[in-house]
Curated annotation (Swiss-Prot):
GO CC annotations, alphabetized: chloroplast
Keyword Plastid attached: yes
Region entry Disordered, spans: 1-20
Pfam families: PAP_fibrillin
Main location: plastid
Stretches with biased composition (Low complexity): 1-17
PANTHER family registered for this protein in UniProt: PLASTID-LIPID-ASSOCIATED PROTEIN 4, CHLOROPLASTIC-RELATED (PTHR31906)
Subcellular location: Plastid, Chloroplast
Family from the record: Belongs to the PAP/fibrillin family.
Entry annotated with the keyword DNA repair: no
Identification of the protein by name: Probable plastid-lipid-associated protein 2, chloroplastic
The organism's taxonomic lineage, starting at the top: Eukaryota, Viridiplantae, Streptophyta, Embryophyta, Tracheophyta
InterPro entries: PAP, PAP/fibrillin_dom
Length: 319
């Protein structure tokens, strides 16, 4: 399952018209998720073999820069060899399990300590060295579907993620990217929830393949989803106040009337179409470099060596 604002962080620089202070502040967030093409996941045989790991930092650094010449390498190689007696599939599975464990409780990287970040970077480097899909854009069907953001080192996204520390106001429920390789489109989406409603902010974009690992993304429009109001009021039969039990049964009729009114309002508002805002600017595009890709895990690198780890919807890595 890259920036212009917090969302634009994942791999793109997006500028959109400012319909309102609130809308414009949130529209940039979805533009953040970057991505690259995807190849089919090759069959990994259990036969042991030695692997040479290459650091991909060099490729990632120029994601937003000019496309380098084909013969320009730029990245120092960090060699890591896999034990000859360890099957590649088992080794990759073990690394992914360790990565999942390292990301637990980090809130997409917001709460990660320096030690955890160092561990995550080390695990990512080892996975990149064993990337089963060295040329993602040559097999885009593997990139198809919805990807959920599990971790990022992109600091400009943290203010948005930090809203989750105020559960009484707004909480970021999910940041995702949905890719359609047949139509060459991508949608970045952030879902928010509050005490009385849920909504989403997303961006739609087109992408073009520019190299075996890189794609160019150009955003077309921003979308503010119609708020979905909470239309159910749960009222307990009684509660305790200063040691005294208060019976709320006589109030159920009153709250039932309020709930019916709320349901009517919710249906009316939820039935309205989402607000679409065209993005018409030359700066609403970005590069994305994919450094690891299989059928359940995607790792991308962005400007300033930012890292994005995404899990495929339905993957066991999410649970």
């Amino acid at each position: 399952m890259a920036g212009s604002s917090s969302l634009s962080t994942l791999s793109l620089c997006t500028q959109s018209p400012s319909p309102s202070p609130v809308a414009s502040a949130r529209l940039v967030a979805p533009a953040v998720l970057g991505f690259a093409g995807a190849p089919r996941f090759p069959t990994l045989r259990a036969a042991p073999r030695r692997l040479t790991a290459r650091a991909v930092a060099g490729d990632a650094e120029d994601e937003w820069g000019k496309e380098p010449a084909a013969d320009q390498g730029g990245a120092a190689a960090a060699v890591a060899e896999a034990p000859a007696d360890v099957p590649v599939t088992s080794e990759v599975a073990e690394l992914k399990a360790k990565l999942k464990e390292a990301l637990y409780g980090t809130e997409r990287g917001l709460r990660a300590s320096s030690e955890t970040r160092a561990e995550v970077v080390e695990l990512i480097t080892q996975l990149e060295a064993r990337n089963p899909t060295p040329a993602p854009t040559e097999a885009l069907t593997l990139l198809n579907g919805k990807w959920i953001l599990a971790y990022t080192s992109f600091s400009q996204l943290f203010p948005l993620l930090g809203s989750g520390s105020l559960p009484q106001l707004v909480k970021v429920e999910e940041i995702s990217q949905t890719i359609d390789s047949e139509n060459f489109t991508v949608q970045n989406c952030i879902k928010f929830s509050g005490p009385l409603a849920t909504t989403s902010v997303s961006t739609n974009a087109k992408f073009e393949v520019r190299s075996p690992k890189r794609v160019q993304i150009k955003f077309d429009e921003g979308i503010i989803g119609t708020p979905q109001l909470t239309d159910s009021i749960v009222l307990p039969e009684k509660f305790e106040l200063f040691g005294q039990n208060i019976d709320l049964t006589p109030l159920k009729g009153i709250f039932s009337s309020i709930e019916n009114a709320a349901s009517s309002v919710a249906r009316t508002i939820s039935g309205q179409p989402p607000l679409k805002i065209p993005i018409r600017t030359d700066n609403a595009e970005s590069w994305l470099l994919t450094t690891y890709l299989d059928d359940e895990l995607r790792i991308s690198r962005g400007d300033g060596s930012s890292i994005f780890v995404l899990f495929k919807e339905g993957s066991t890595l999410l649970y």
